[in-house]
Amino acid sequence: MISVLLTSAGTDSAVALCEALRAGFSTGLRLVGVDTRTAVACMPWLDHFARVPLRRSPGFMDEVVRLCEQHGITHVWPLSTEEQIIMALERATRLAGTVVIGSSADVVEVANDKVRLYDACAAGGLPLPAYQVVGDPASLHRAARDLGYPDRPVVLKAALGTGAAGLKIIRAGIPRLEMFHSRLNRDVTLEVAAAQLDGVSPWPSLMLTEYLPGEEFSVDVLRFRGAWKGGVVRRRDESLFGLATDATVVDRPDVLEQARRVADHVGVEFVSNIQFRGAEDGRPLLMEINPRVPGTIGLSVAAGSNLPAVALALAAGRDAVLAPPRIGTRIIRYFAGTVLPG
């Protein structure tokens, strides 16, 4: 029996992940989910759900360990980036009797920090957009000029932002009323971006990059014990807060090869997601890594590449091979939900 504890079971990826695991393991699989919420959308796919304390509270790991013992957990699969670090640090101590499905703590810390990630990839000779670290308003204005502003847009990124948090596309000449009415509050002028940061102390870790005008790609990748097992390239045609709302599986060997190079260089393990965007000359350049199961993993699974099931099989010591995806498979998201009985 494979018994898996899923932490942060209320994340965007949880339902698709549970569906993928159920499809890959018709028998011999027990899923236990935990979250700080009283209920989560993936509950119908779980054998048991438990509410746990906040991850930063002293009782969080105590409850995780108790549940592992109670349910005979063989594998712990953290679904949030923050909990990947926590579980990775505990894998040799309190979780020594289980397999943690995730990258090592040092790899997650690099992958989740865009400044450290870009510096590491630059040192490895991987193609990147031009970028500069900005540490105060003066360096923000200076970097913007160096990267071509106001003639070209530039992109301001929080080093530790996820889900498009801390992301600003800086363009010249945007009317103030247009920025006021913007739902996303993403496109701003340099003056507005600087004003939003005026007086902030301490200054957050920020970087400014060139704007990439090409197509955006999101690559689901699978590595196990340092070996590349395959990936699926998805073109992101529309997105909202970092989550693809219209995406298609495409045949782009060049993008897949770049994803392999980045994954191998950084050292992510199991299922991760690497995002690229095309430069003016069409080259796919790295945007970021999500060192966890992505929110749109269901598209790769629907296309025939069940990365989560293969990852779990490998973690359980079984032989498994990732099937190639069906090119052209597309997802168009709409709002739906899980109805729980009263």
Question: What do these predicted regions represent?
Answer:
Residues F180-R260, G278-L285:
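Phosphate-binding site of ATP-dependent enzymes
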Residues V108-S205, R225:
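Active-site nucleotide/adenylate-binding loops and adjacent lid/helix of ATP-dependent enzymes
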Residues M1-S103, A138:
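ATP-binding N-terminal substructure of ATP-dependent carboxylate-amine bond-forming enzymes
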Residues G231-V233, D264-L299:
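Conserved metal-phosphate-binding beta-hairpin within the catalytic cores
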Residues A164, R236-T248, N290-G304:
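Glycine-rich phosphate/pyrophosphate-binding beta-alpha loops
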Residues A279, A309-G342:
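Peripheral (often C-terminal) accessory segments that flank ATP-dependent C-N-forming ligase machineries
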Residues M1-L5, P153, M207:
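Residues that mark the start of a beta-strand
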